[in-house]
């Protein structure tokens, strides 16, 4: 340390066959939940002397594939994808990837996955809203193409309402993008109908 010597990362990579780099692909860098996830990833990687290369995709599945391909061709030891949805192109990449991939937030048989109980969360939310509501209930969600945050949460929400003797009536459901602005627009649409 006194001499200022720093070992060459390229020499270490040649010697150990490891880059000690993990590519992390996230849908939105400025999302609170994604910030927490990336902070947790960085903490664990740092404890193991790994570094993170971070790429944001602005909720665009095609960009997820683009960045995973970039990282696959860069000397990374693995990729972590916080996925928006798993498309046929995602499955193809995951089946053929030369580096290990972990998917967070979605389920696929082609990678190790860490995902939440979106159905259970939606159901708990449906029960809680039904217990406090005296009027009509509305739901704003993302596209059902997103099997986790879209389909599973909506199905769980509807089940929670049903268990509480309520239902989501026609016209009280809106599909939004995964942004606060889009959610706000859908609230205004509901209020103006």
Which positions does each model-derived feature cover?
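Hinge/beta->alpha junction and helix N-cap segments in small-molecule ligand-binding domains
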Residues: 27-36, 54-63, 114-124, 140-162, ...
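Flexible loop/hinge segments that line or gate small-molecule binding clefts
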Residues: 59, 81-127, 131, 144-145
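Non-catalytic positions within long, well-ordered alpha-helices that form the structural scaffold/packing
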Residues: 65, 72, 130, 191-192
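Short hydrophobic/charged patches on amphipathic alpha-helices used for structural packing
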Residues: 11, 65-68, 91, 126, ...
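Periplasmic-binding protein-like
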Residues: 76-82, 138-141, 173, 190-193
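Amphipathic helical "hinge" segments at domain boundaries
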Residues: 5-78
